[in-house]
């Protein structure tokens, strides 16, 4: 990054913080707070019992939640040398799926080690609260945008570069932390009810989704 690019980035962050102070939040494009890159190329056949932590796009749909500090699988150090990595606080997003509902499912990587990331993914490197962004990417606010970005018939895809145009209502980092704390409690409560009656589970899940979307919707200060 050149000195001029660094100055522009600093100016942009200053404007964002000023708007957050005045209005309580600011609508920003993902490109203003993050960079997006594609994942690597390892496959399931490369999995091993120990080695370098790795996140495979297929497991983001089925095995991961909002965030993770440990991976489910590993790959060897030799294979990992040529792979793309997610560092702590990055968002790893699966950008292909069989349906619009599941495409762009993501996980905030909070592990201490870098994690190798498979293909069919986007690695979002940013300067915000990772879990806040992960919750946003699971919300109806994002769903409406990704429907416009998605393309394909049998395989639905969102091109990683197009994610940069996603608009996010962004409060201050302190407010992001407060929202994450509340949503984490809801998430834990829903998980604790996972062995209950189906109707009860569904009702609590809908309640959780409602409050999640409300917490991620902002109005300007008067």
Q: How would you label these PLM feature ranges?
A:
Residues 33-43, 59-90:
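Sequence-specific dsDNA recognition surfaces
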Residues 56, 81-140:
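A short beta-sheet element
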Residues 8, 19-39, 200-206, 211:
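Non-catalytic DNA-recognition/assembly elements of restriction-modification systems
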Residues 25-30, 52, 86, 90-92, ...:
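Short, structured motif recognition centered on aromatic/hydrophobic residues
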Residues 114-120, 151-172:
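A short glycine-rich beta-alpha junction/loop motif
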Residues 2-10:
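Short ILV/T-rich hydrophobic faces within alpha-helical DNA-binding bundles, principally
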Residues 19, 24, 41-42, 79-80, ...:
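Short, solvent-exposed loop/turn positions at domain surfaces
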